[in-house]
From Swiss-Prot:
Residues engaged in binding Zn(2+): C334, H385, H511
NCBIfam families, per the entry: thrS (TIGR00418)
Organism: Idiomarina loihiensis (strain ATCC BAA-735 / DSM 15497 / L2-TR)
Role this protein plays: Catalyzes the attachment of threonine to tRNA(Thr) in a two-step reaction: L-threonine is first activated by ATP to form Thr-AMP and then transferred to the acceptor end of tRNA(Thr). Also edits incorrectly charged L-seryl-tRNA(Thr).
Any Pfam family matching the protein: tRNA_SAD
Catalytic activity: tRNA(Thr) + L-threonine + ATP = L-threonyl-tRNA(Thr) + AMP + diphosphate + H(+)
Entry protein name: Threonine--tRNA ligase
GO cellular component: cytosol
Cofactor note: Binds 1 zinc ion per subunit.
Keywords in alphabetical order: Aminoacyl-tRNA synthetase, ATP-binding, Cytoplasm, Ligase, Metal-binding, Nucleotide-binding, Protein biosynthesis, RNA-binding, tRNA-binding, Zinc
Keyword field contains Metal-binding: yes
Length: 638
């Protein structure tokens, strides 16, 4: 007779095997009504799952993250149900959960249109309103295969043949006449799948392989209630307004061309911001005693083979040949930095040696994955490598952590999630080395009172890493900074130092990036600030506008003075009404709008307005310059 232990420690005894739903009903009718699924001894299961032995259980409802995840997964099945009713010959591939939603890949002769998506959503709503029960049946591998052969579902058959052992018992979920295969869990009833929206469609190769057939992917979002769905759609609308590609066009920051996919054409305004980011990071590098270096753009394939990158990374590397030698354009900077370290004999007294580079890297990302500045082929890393002894690791990692947090705070990011990624399946080095690496990073985080969680199997192939994820004003997550420990690469490339014992030792290498890709970080900033850059980053910091031609000479003189002081200023001397000029430069998001009339000329002053519409009144020019210089020096965030 199973004894069920609940999260609060209370226990309930049953005289026969009991399901999660029955336990919920025993606790209370309201809880049973809200039950989506459950956990048995930590394992997420369907509400119909029977408990035959003593166990600890948790009830999962739509208020839980797991509950929302399950609702989204079941909405993917609901989409499959609707599509098969409308296009019976459609072949269903996969329908997983993704961030904030789900998708289904579908093979059908009909090309879906926006009108079709609206019809699919309407049919899904009609089906969900009937609140039909979702019935899970466990089948043998053979029974599952026969089911999908009978239903002419080749993708489900392939999944069974290639991915599922023949001794497995796949879960078949019955949505009335529609059957889908999944490990689950899923909602027990479609009453939970009421708050969703079909978002868009795209092409997707089966199994992500361009040699396979292109399928049609339909995306959707789903939430626990109407309020959550509405809030999400509002966030999307705001994100659309903040799209860095639109703002870049409006502010003349950069552009793209088909002749250079994934490569940025920086315009003066955009390059000004880019250089300010570099300048700031250089200041931090000096503060933390890094040496700035510059490695070659291309190196012989032999070096990449020796480093291990060729084996693990070659499909993403651009290559070229010359004089019977094959070269690779660098996708990362670390092998080059080891070569610089190897020049000249190093002693333990030289360690730690902190080496940094604004490395221009290239990766041959699939064209379909490219997305503005967020996913490019040519990018600049604020990359650094610290060569140190094992005894110095924790102190050096602590310094990196401090530098990361200070940098993000400068840009206004203070909500930071930290993950420790551990050994992947494909990796360099032995288990003992990985044990030491993972322990060192975990201890450095604990010693600095950093809350973190583990990402098992997500480390780099050469060592574990700490990942820093920022959350922007819309709640979106951006993984930017990394600190990676590497006991493997220095040894592979022959890096050594002479220790206190006069013997040669291999240094530990710490890979460190804060912004990550400067291009991507700039895209994040454009959207975070919605183009309203803080003064120190703004391409044009001040614009001066005359009211009549009488003030033109004074405006030119003031602009020259400001530029000589290092303040990026421009003049608008057009024969337009002052209100028109103010509106135009407000839309261009220039931080300070200075209006000059006869009175300002006579007094040697400027009338100051902000892009937010605030009238700050008249300032003597020197006082205004002091204000701007202070704001830039402190890198004030609006």
């Amino acid at each position: 007779m199973p004894v069920i232990t609940l999260p609060d420690g209370s226990q309930r005894e049953f005289d026969k095997p009991v399901s999660i739903m029955e336990v919920a009903a025993d606790i209370g009718a309201g809880l049973a009504k809200a039950t989506v699924a459950g956990r048995i001894d930590g394992e997420l299961v369907d509400a119909c799952e029977l408990i035959e032995h003593d166990a600890r259980i948790e009830i999962v409802t739509p208020k839980d993250d797991d509950g929302v995840h399950i609702i989204r997964h079941s909405c993917a099945h609901l989409m499959g149900h609707a599509v098969k009713q409308m296009w019976p010959d459609a072949k269903m591939a996969i329908g997983p959960v993704i961030d904030n939603g789900f998708y289904y890949d579908i093979d059908v002769d009909h090309t879906f249109t926006q009108e079709d998506l609206e019809k699919i959503e309407k049919r899904m709503k009609e089906l969900a309103k009937t609140e039909y029960a979702v019935v899970k049946k466990k089948a043998s591998w053979k029974e599952a295969r026969e089911t999908f052969v009978e239903r002419h579902e080749p993708y489900k058959i392939e999944i069974l043949d290639e991915d599922i052992p023949t001794d497995a018992t796949p879960g078949l979920y019955h949505h009335e006449e529609y059957i889908d295969m999944c490990r689950g869990p899923h909602v027990p009833n479609m009453k939970f799948c009421q708050h969703f929206k079909i978002m868009k469609m795209a092409g997707a190769y089966w199994r992500g392989d361009s040699d396979n057939k292109m399928l049609q992917r339909i995306y959707g979002t789903a939430w626990a209630d109407k309020k959550q769905l509405k809030a999400y759609l509002q966030r999307l609308e705001e994100a659309e307004k903040r799209d860095h590609r639109k703002i870049a066009k409006a502010q003349d920051l950069f552009h793209w061309q088909e002749e250079a996919p994934g490569m940025v054409f920086w315009h003066h305004n955009g390059w000004t911001i880019f250089r300010e980011l570099e300048t700031y990071i250089r200041e931090k590098m000096r503060e933390y005693e890094y040496q700035e270096v510059k490695g070659p753009m291309m190196m012989d394939r032999v070096l990449w083979e020796k480093s291990g990158h060729w084996e693990k990374f070659s499909e993403l590397m651009f290559t070229t040949s010359s004089e019977n030698r094959e070269y690779a354009v660098k996708p990362m900077n670390c092998p080059g930095h080891v070569q610089i370290f190897n020049q000249g004999l190093k002693s333990y007294r030289d360690l730690p040696l902190r080496m940094a580079e604004f490395g221009s890297c290239h990766r041959n990302e699939p064209s379909g994955a490219l997305h503005g500045l967020m996913r490019v082929r040519g990018f600049t890393q604020d990359d650094a490598h610290i060569f140190c002894t094992e005894q110095q690791v924790q102190e050096e990692v602590a310094g990196c952590i401090k530098m990361v947090y200070e940098t993000y705070k400068t840009f206004g990011f203070e909500n930071i999630d930290v993950k420790l990624s551990t050994r992947p399946e494909k990796r360099l080095g032995d288990d003992a080395t990985w044990d030491r690496s993972e322990t060192a990073l975990a201890q450095a985080l604990k010693n600095n009172d950093i809350d973190f969680s583990y990402l098992p199997g997500e480390g780099a192939f050469y060592g574990p890493k700490i990942e820093f994820t920022l959350f922007d004003c819309l709640g979106r997550a951006w993984q930017c900074g990394t600190i990676q420990l590497d006991f493997a690469l220095p040894g592979r490339l022959g890096a050594t130092y002479v220790g206190e014992d006069n013997e040669r030792h291999t240094p530990v290498m710490i890979h460190r990036a804060i912004l990550g890709s400067l291009e991507r970080f700039m895209g994040i900033l454009i959207e975070e600030y919605a183009g309203h850059f803080p003064l120190w980053l703004s391409p044009t910091q001040v614009v001066l506008m005359n009211i009549t031609d009488n003030q033109s000479d004074y405006v030119r003189k003031v602009v020259k003075t400001l530029n000589e002081k290092g303040i990026r200023a421009s003049a608008d001397l057009r024969n337009e009404k002052i209100g028109f000029k103010i509106r135009e430069h407000t839309l261009k998001r220039v931080p300070y709008l200075l209006v000059v009339g006869d009175k300002e000329v006579e007094a040697g002053e400027v009338a100051v307005r902000t892009r937010g519409g605030e009238d700050l009144g008249k300032f003597p020019l020197e006082d205004f310059i002091t204000r701007v210089e202070d704001e830039v020096r402190t890198r004030k965030i609006d």
